[in-house]
Structures are given as C-alpha cells and as structure tokens.
C-alpha cells in the first residue's frame, strides 16, 4: 500500500512539473504574431526592420521569463524561418537594428537547446 501511494505521488508530482513547464513556454502563435512584421527585412525585401517589427520583438522580449521561454522562441523562429525564406545575413541584424538584447545568436543555424 505504501509503494502504491508513493508511486501515485511521484506520478502526480511529475505531471504537475510538466504542466508548469508547458505553461511557461511562449507559444509559437505568439512568436509568429509578434515577429510577423520582420519578415520583409529578414527575407531581404525591406531595407531595414520596420517600427512594427521592432515593437513586436520588444513586446516578445518582455514575455521571456525563463530559459525555457528563450528556447521555445528560438525553436518557433527556426521553424517559421524555413517556410518563409528567411536569410541569415538579414536576420542576424535585427536585434541590433531594433536595440534588443536576445541573449543568444540569432541565426537559422542556432542550436536552440544550447541556449542558457
């Protein structure tokens, strides 16, 4: 009986931890919405990031509460960049142009799992 209690307790604790982790991560829909105005510059169609791009990314940066959030944002951006034709030579310039510190290299080649 004692073993069953501890097994159930462990399982519930584990599930609660998973729920907290998944709630903490920034959803891709939010990332896509906030970064949408940056696509023109990131694909080379616009000569500089728009003010809407910078505002969206600043708002996105304010949602970051943890390393898991940074990793989630990185994964979302990488996934979107493949389908949108994002070019690294433009993408990497966005943080400086928008005066945003992201804490990791902005590139389609970034290994999101190494972000800390």
Curated annotation (Swiss-Prot):
**Entry keyword Zinc:** no
Q: Which SMART domains match?
A: AAI
Per UniProt, which keywords does this protein have? Answer: Disulfide bond, Lipid-binding, Signal, Transport
Q: Which Gene3D superfamilies match?
A: Plant lipid-transfer and hydrophobic proteins (1.10.110.10)
Q: Which family, according to the similarity comment?
A: Belongs to the plant LTP family.
Protein name as annotated: Non-specific lipid-transfer protein D, cotyledon-specific isoform
Q: Which domain of life is it from?
A: Eukaryota
Signal peptide stretch: 1-24
Taken from the UniProt record, the cysteine pairs bridged by disulfide bonds within this chain are 28-76, 38-53, 54-98, 74-112
What GO terms in the biological process aspect are recorded for it?
Answer: lipid transport
InterPro entries tied to this protein: Bifun_inhib/LTP/seed_sf, Bifunc_inhib/LTP/seed_store, Plant_nsLTP
Protein's job: Plant non-specific lipid-transfer proteins transfer phospholipids as well as galactolipids across membranes. May play a role in wax or cutin deposition in the cell walls of expanding epidermal cells and certain secretory tissues.
Q: Which organism is it from?
A: Ricinus communis (Castor bean)
Gene Ontology MF annotations = lipid binding
């Amino acid at each position: 009986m004692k073993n069953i209690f501890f097994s159930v307790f462990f399982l519930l604790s584990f599930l609660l931890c998973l729920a907290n982790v998944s709630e903490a991560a920034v959803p891709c829909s939010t990332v896509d919405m906030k970064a949408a105005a940056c696509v023109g510059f990131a694909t080379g169609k616009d000569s500089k990031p728009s003010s809407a791009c910078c505002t969206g990314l600043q708002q996105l940066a304010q949602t970051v509460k943890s390393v898991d959030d940074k990793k989630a944002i990185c994964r979302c951006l990488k996934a979107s960049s493949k389908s949108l034709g994002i070019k690294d030579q433009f993408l990497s310039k966005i943080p400086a142009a928008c005066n945003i510190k992201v804490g990791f290299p902005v590139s389609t080649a970034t290994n999101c799992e190494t972000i800390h």
